[in-house]
Design a protein with these regions (language model features):
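ANL superfamily adenylate-forming
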Residues: 1-41
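Conserved adenylate-forming
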Residues: 26-43, 47-90, 110-112
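Conserved S/T- and glycine-rich ATP-binding loop of Class I adenylate-forming
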Residues: 44, 50-53, 88, 94, ...
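Conserved AMP-binding/adenylation subdomain of ANL enzymes
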Residues: 68-87, 95-135, 146, 150-151
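Conserved AMP-binding
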Residues: 91-96, 169
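Alpha-helix capping/helix-boundary segments
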Residues: 121, 142-144, 171
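Gly/Ser/Thr-rich phosphate-binding loop
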Residues: 134-139, 148-193
Length: 193
């Protein structure tokens, strides 16, 4: 059992440890990091685990090509995204493909700033909306409905939001109208069941 624990807690083969990645990147542009192998679009970048809603949970292997394609599709929904400095409200969990793509990888790709929420708490969201004025808000319909209601109730202007991207469930047309009227920005539906 001890040897199994040591094996599971030791560095994974053919990987760059997080500490080395961050440590090298702080002092330079990250180009000095040696990767353990050649990386191309078909190389597995990460494994995300499913919730098991239609069966047992399983690891979905995502390649570098998958991540890049998702990133480019997300960016294409909002023409001009990244042409100006962007500040993104990161209310989605990063352990989900939607949050990882529309917040983490997209922010890195366009050089955007992430305003990260430790938990989905409306009072915190509104404090951050007021303090940081995000320009990009990926989320779910309920998030947009609650932000507009809280902004109306607390008289917090949210006019700086240029674009929002909705997923996870169907986006009601009333939500789009209220959001776009209140923010002056665009709200598009990407994928909703």
């Amino acid at each position: 059992l001890k040897s199994k624990r040591e094996q599971l807690s030791s560095p994974a083969p053919n990987t760059v440890p997080w500490e080395a990645l961050v440590g090298n990147a702080i002092g330079g542009d990250g180009r000095d990091i040696t990767t353990p192998e050649d990386v191309d679009k078909d190389t597995i970048a990460l494994i995300m685990y499913t919730s098991g809603t239609t069966g047992k949970p399983k690891g979905a292997m995502l390649s570098h090509g998958n991540l890049f394609s998702n990133l480019m599709q997300g960016k294409a929904w909002v023409p001009g995204l990244g042409d100006k400095p962007e500040r993104m409200l990161a209310a989605l969990p990063f352990f989900h493909a939607y949050g990882l793509t529309m917040n983490v990888t997209l922010a890195q790709f366009i050089g955007g700033e992430l305003v990260i929420l430790p938990k989905p708490d409306m009072s915190l969201i509104m404090q951050l909306m007021k303090k940081h004025t995000p320009t990009w808000v990926p989320g779910v319909p309920t998030l947009y409905e609650r932000i507009v209601k809280a902004a109306e109730d607390q008289e917090i202007p949210i006019k700086g939001v240029r674009a929002a991207f909705s997923g996870a469930s169907t986006l009601p047309s009333d939500t789009v109208k209220k959001w776009e009227s209140y923010t002056g920005g665009l709200l598009v539906e990407g994928y909703g069941l």
